[in-house]
Amino acid sequence: MQKVKLPLTLDPVRTAQKRLDYQGIYTPDQVERVAESVVSVDSDVECSMSFAIDNQRLAVLTGDAVVTVSLECQRCGKPFTHQVHTTYCFSPVRSDEQAEALPEAYEPIEVNEFGEIDLLATVEDEIILALPVVPVHDSEHCEVSEADMVFGELPDEAQKPNPFAVLASLKRK
């Protein structure tokens, strides 16, 4: 299958009325905000999107995105590869009142003054939200052993004298 670049912006209502489906990619160069959140973006962002009108006559965008990124393990500090897969379901709105009236199944997405949505920013947002809060290797792949991880009371050799103890004695005088 040929890799097709997706549009950056589009009119979601017109697209939903035509019931269009998109399958394509965003290149690593295009997803700058994702690149700022990870060590590196290792693959194209592969997206599939479907636009439709639901039973309540709302325009709906459903889809998913998959990308492979490198993250820094927070235990050992080494980079590791992680595949991010996210799904989404949006409905375009023009105001907060419309957003409040949406069914819970739909996330609101604001349209600009031309009635278009920023598709790239939407996909980037979903990928960033799907990234792990604390990225770590699986325990068997991490170079930090279970013995090196200390929980609760610190061993005696790890407890150092408080450097501010001198200040406490001066305060008493």
From Swiss-Prot:
The keyword Membrane does not apply. This is Large ribosomal RNA subunit accumulation protein YceD. Transmembrane segments: none annotated. Plays a role in synthesis, processing and/or stability of 23S rRNA. The keyword Transit peptide does not apply. Belongs to the DUF177 domain family. One of its GO terms (biological process) is ribosome biogenesis. GO terms for cellular component: cytosol. Induction: Part of the yceD-rpmF operon, which may continue into downstream genes. InterPro entries: YceD, YceD_bac. Keywords: Ribosome biogenesis.
